[in-house]
Regions:
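Domain-level signal for soluble alpha/beta catalytic cores
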Residues: 12-15
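Long, charge-dense
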Residues: 17-64
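Long, contiguous domain-sized segments
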Residues: 40-44, 55-62, 69-224
């Protein structure tokens, strides 16, 4: 099971005594994207500049893993010093992409934080057996399948021969260039069950079925 949304599914799997080993991975989009960014180079800006609800310049910088001081520094360079907390429209966020992509100072900060987080993240995945040579799949709530893509990129940075598939409650869409054969949805998928999507509230779903602990933000090695 992947991330907090896989919490209840892992419990159900264990209760039904399926003949499969089921582990709970503590991860999130954020905890995987930060160490992934330096592998993506300038393409990481596409992950950082995503639309959403109540997106501000500060939130965009936090997605990149920047500190408060670094956020302010880039805000000054990009002309957002006095509007860091203003809500950005989707079109404004898209216009921000080329600005950040061409800002070497910003990218240097992003890569630095990413490289710092990379080693412990890989160590955690290794600790959980993802490099042991066994076949595995991930189970998650779904929505756009980006966790699977980030997890794949991190794993392939160590061993490109490791492949796995994802099983989801529902998928609205797939990541760019993702192979549909590696993504399996139960309740609705990218090209079907429009009515189910209209009636479904993923916020309620997550509120009811998520794990009791907070979101995983990073990994740290302790006591060797």
């Amino acid at each position: 099971s992947a991330a907090s949304d896989g919490y209840k599914r892992q419990q159900l799997c264990q209760a039904m005594e399926y003949d499969i080993e089921c582990k709970y991975l503590s991860l999130s989009r954020y905890s995987l994207r930060i160490p992934e960014f330096h592998l993506m180079k300038e393409q990481c800006v596409d992950r950082i500049c995503l639309g959403g609800i109540d997106v501000t310049f500060e939130k965009v910088m936090k997605r990149a893993g920047l500190t408060d001081a670094e956020c302010l520094s880039i805000a000054k360079e990009c002309g957002y010093k006095d509007s860091m907390h203003d809500i950005l429209s989707y079109s404004t966020i898209m216009e921000l992409k080329p600005v950040l992509r061409s800002n070497k100072h910003f990218l240097k900060m992003v890569y630095s934080h990413s490289e710092h987080a990379y080693s412990d993240t890989i160590s955690y995945l290794r600790q959980e057996g993802l490099f042991d040579g066994l076949s595995f799949a991930i189970a998650d709530s779904g929505w756009i399948g980006s966790i699977q893509q980030s997890l794949k990129n991190l794993i392939h940075s160590v061993n490109p021969s490791i492949n796995f598939e994802g099983y989801y409650f529902g998928l609205y869409d797939l990541p760019d260039k993702a192979s549909a054969s590696n993504y399996h949805a139960f309740y609705f998928g990218p090209g079907n069950h429009i009515l189910r999507k209209m009636r479904f509230c993923n916020c309620l779903y997550e509120a009811v079925l998520s794990a009791p602990e907070g979101m995983t933000v990073s990994y740290e090695c302790t006591d060797n």
